Regions:
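Short, mixed-charge amphipathic alpha-helical segments
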Residues: 97-123, 209-216
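Charged alpha-helical initiation segments
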Residues: 1-46
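Cystatin/cathelin-like cysteine-protease inhibitor module
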Residues: 152-286
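Charge-enriched, short contiguous segments at helix-coil
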Residues: 113-161
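Short, charged amphipathic alpha-helical segments flanked by flexible coils
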Residues: 68-113
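Short, solvent-exposed secondary-structure capping/transition elements
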Residues: 60-72, 136-141, 158-169, 236-240
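Short, well-structured alpha-helical interface segments that form or flank functional binding sites
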Residues: 24-27, 43-54, 115-118, 122, ...
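Short, hydrophobic, well-ordered secondary-structure elements
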Residues: 33, 44-67
Length: 286
């Protein structure tokens, strides 16, 4: 059973490590798990619980610094007499959604914060229980050690995965907003680079062939989107076309674009701050 337990713990460790960024966090995880391996130590679960709780605390503090949580538009102190007191739940919330509003998280990102927060809070409460050495928490049997430590690490890993999932969904939302902006740029606004080529033009579609992140700071993401826009050029009026005096041709033109997307603001949403789209019509004149 002990070998089976060690394999379980090692598997969980390998799953958790990629989410830890600092050498301190990684060393603390290693030290926490080392406590569990010492079968002769009657305090092994207590020592593990203390180290694991501190790891979670440091991880949350890194992802949700005091100043950021306090400035989040959704933040309200639980105790008006302690306006700068931050609860564990508020740190968990910031780690997952940052400045984004609850409405945006629920309806756009589709993330259930309550379930994740509840599971992690339960795990931390379990850890706290074993950091207090009492007769019932001292020298516990291997089955209890296995059950408690496994559930705690599973909930911790689930929390880490939720944060990563939130980041991925923010990225997907940014991509979707860029696509919507390109629709507006090509289908609603008049593109002078295309308009000068014919009497009338019609956009048939566009294709983004490359979308890359150029830069990211604590408020904005700068994205670059390159691709092609397919257009139909009409020479002559609609009347000319009916009389057979006009003509239409279809061409494909390359475009490049840059977008600055704001993801951290007091509106609690994600929106495009600026968009620059350039269509290259040089190939038309070659």
């Amino acid at each position: 059973m002990r070998i089976h337990f060690c394999r379980f713990m090692n598997k969980l460790k390998q799953s958790i490590l990629p989410y830890l960024e600092t050498s301190f966090e990684k060393d603390l995880l290693e030290a926490a798990l080392k406590n569990l391996e010492d079968g002769k130590n009657k305090l092994r679960l207590n020592n593990f619980a203390y180290a694991a709780r501190e790891l979670t605390r440091h991880y949350l503090k890194r992802l949700a610094p005091d100043i950021e949580v306090l400035n989040a538009p959704w933040f309200k102190p639980n105790d008006p007499k302690k306006p700068k007191a931050i609860t564990r739940e508020q740190r968990i919330k910031y780690a997952i959604q940052g400045y984004l509003s609850d409405d945006f998280r629920e309806n756009v990102l589709k993330i259930d914060l309550d379930e994740v927060s509840k599971n992690l809070k339960t795990s931390i409460d379990d850890l706290s229980k074993y950091t207090h050495v009492e007769p019932e928490t001292f020298d516990v049997d291997l089955a209890t050690v296995t059950d408690v430590s496994y559930n705690i690490l599973e909930d911790t890993l689930r929390f880490f995965k939720t944060i990563k999932e939130a980041q991925l969904r923010v990225g997907e939302t940014v991509d979707a907003y860029i696509d919507e902006e390109l629709v507006s740029q090509f289908y609603i606004e008049t593109r002078d680079e295309i308009d000068i080529l014919a009497t009338h033009y019609e956009v048939l579609g566009f294709l983004v062939t490359e979308l890359i992140q150029l830069a990211k700071d604590d408020k904005t993401i700068t994205m670059k989107a390159d691709g092609f826009v397919n257009v139909r050029l009409q020479y002559g009026s609609d009347g000319d076309m009916r009389r057979g005096d006009g003509c239409k041709i279809e061409i494909k033109l390359p475009f490049t674009s840059t977008f600055v997307v704001n993801y951290k603001n007091h509106d609690g949403d994600i929106h495009i701050e600026s968009a620059i789209v350039n269509v290259d019509n040089d190939s038309f004149f070659e």
